[in-house]
Amino acid sequence: VTAAPAATAATAATPATAALNFAATAATPATPATPALIFAATAATAATPATAALNFAATAATPATAATPALIFAAAAATAATPATAALNFAATAATPATAATPALIFAATAATAATPATPAFHFAATAATPATAATPALIFAATAATAATPATPAFHFAATAATPATAATPALIFAATAATAATPATAALNFAATAATPATAATPALIFAATAATAATPATAALNFAATAATAATPATAACNFAATAATPATAATPALIFAATAATAATPATAACNFAATAATPATAATPALIFAATAATAATPATAALNFAATAATPATAATPALIFAATAATAATPATAALNFAATAATPATAATPALIFAATAATAATPATAALNFAATAATAATPATPAFNFAATAATPATAATPALIFAATAATAATPATAALNFAATAATPATAATPALIFAATAATAATPATAALHFAATAATAATPATAALNFAATAATPATAATPALIFAATAATAATPATAAFNFAATAATAATPATAALNFAATAATPATAATPALIFAATAATAATPATAALNFAATAATPATAATPALIFAATAATAATPATPAFHFAATAATPATAATPALIFAATAATAATPATAALNFAATAATAATPATAALNFAATAATPATAATPALIFAATAATAATPATAALNFAATAATPATAATPALIFAATAATAATPATAAFNFAATAATAATPATAATPALIFAATAATAATPATPATPALIFAATAATAATPATPALNFAATAATAATTAARG
């Protein structure tokens, strides 16, 4: 099987080729089976002690656990036979002759060979820690430079597990991590929360999404992405938290406009913790208090650095029993099971009493002996107590609804204690609303949920897309990340964050959707309250793809209802093939040429605001060589005849005007548009402006191989696209597996029907040619790209 989904141009001539996406392990001859773990990749070779730029969940494979699990969200591949092969693209497979079915790895890839020492230009976690580039680890989303003292130090990303000899089988948890034991105090260099600040490597943790590396020696060092603080004595107020920004002082003009967090509270500025999405008020006593992102644990004296949990840390101290600073899940481990609940977006601290505890995914239960089924669910759980039966204690908005603190929800990433006094106080964070008797129908929607009431026609404070388009307000696309619940009384009200608006009494089926569900009632046919995908399949459209991470619920009644969720486009009869793009979708209809109220970066490119590019997370304007080429996902351009420059790209719109040629203040990638191609390449999180001059250009983001002159338009991968070559016409359904690729080895040829995994989709066969509105895994099987191979 060709490794089409990867398209890697790693030749000996281009040593830096391996711009691996979401992980890359420098498979050395010594460790042929190195787990190119997804959401975790380890590449620590003896030669490069700091090499362990683990991505999203590295596991320090000890000799005891040789059979490292080809983890989902991970996959092992690199064999000695194909040293540089795996330039995997969010799902690439380094198909070697020995392992034909090598796991079409998702979110990771292994490649670096001894021949190319600087190879791992890892994306979202790469560290080229060579002696020559000491300051290398500009790690993204993780990366800790293991010190000589702890060569195998689990600088886990999104779930490091401090594998101690006692727990050899320690779960290499993903999206969660278990705190290191007293034996390894600084071990937990967890990403999304921890800092492995050891005396030896003071500036080490260039942690992303949480990590402060403020050392006196390197004042401006931590230009961390998504969470860095360069808190030096010279810049006391430097905590330029994004999503919580701090007033830049004249002394530090270039203060890191940190994204999604960063606090560096120095003694001079005790309250500076303008933390993003989970800040902790630094007290004078703890000047360097962990500017934890998406979680923060108050390490107790007994376990100094222990609970550096990622995405679920709980500083369960006996003094603060109710402490649940739960993030995306997090169970407050009880005294009986001190380190147990290192839940991974689902982990369950299965105590002897509850052996069968549901190892919920995207929902975790912190089953303690006292409360066996306590459902502190992640991403959807409701802690329905007898007192409050419908109390959506959603994670991403979990509320520890105790009788004493009914309104408790100091929810992280969501939570509003809507009291009767402030009925419309929808300060929802990522969704939740503590429904009070007064507002019974408050849909504590998660990642979606719109509840446009008749009273407030424009109230559509949509979350990431959803629009509860009622017949009265057809074009109500008041997108979130820009949503405004403009009511006469509280015009600026909705300080909505990734959140949602509560549905009205008219729709009793209060779509408390969790990442998908839509309670499509007959009364509201177009109620596309899609949650990260779900489509309310009406009788008329029985086969509607209930896509995950993308879904279109367009009914004939509301043709322009494009309440896309993270992309979905309501395919109208006129545009049957409209790409229900994920993370990028344009619903530009002829009637509303400027319609694209894009989420996460929409730019209303009007003649008046030519330089508008509020680029987010990427955006590159391709050169004249490939004018209309990359209509990549994560950045679709809805260029209609009426608005040729309408590229209101999602997650990366660029309004490249001749005046601002170098415009793209690109984030997470983006190549600067040239004057020749005004709005063209709205690349998706990985667009590469493959010009003959910059053949090696790979500004790869989340995927994207730098198309060389030989294959100009080739690798337009979508989070896991597989370029099904003509060689395998029989496998049209090539598993563009997403978030779970199965590595069917030659040993098990009996499992050809690779699971059409969730968070993935297999490209439909010839019977349904246009079918694959694949989510997070579009297969680019075109006849033109037969040569597309890894």
From Swiss-Prot:
Modified how: O-glycosylated; contains disaccharide galactose-N-acetylgalactosamine attached to threonines in AFGP8 and AFGP7.
Q: Where does it primarily localize?
A: secreted
Q: Name any GO cellular component annotation.
A: extracellular region
Tissues/organs with expression: Synthesized by the liver and secreted into the blood from which they become distributed to almost the entire extracellular space.
This protein's UniProt keywords:
Antifreeze protein, Glycoprotein, Repeat, Secreted
Q: Does the keyword Glycoprotein apply?
A: yes
Q: Name its cellular compartments.
A: Secreted
The residue range of the signal peptide is: none
Entry annotated with the keyword Transmembrane: no
Q: Which residues form the propeptide?
A: 1-5
- Could you tell me what this protein does? Antifreeze proteins lower the blood freezing point.
Q: What is known of its domains?
A: Contains 44 copies of AFGP8 and two copies of AFGP7.
Indicate what this protein is called per its UniProt record.
Answer: Ice-structuring glycoprotein
- State the species of origin: Notothenia neglecta
Q: Which gene encodes it?
A: afgp8
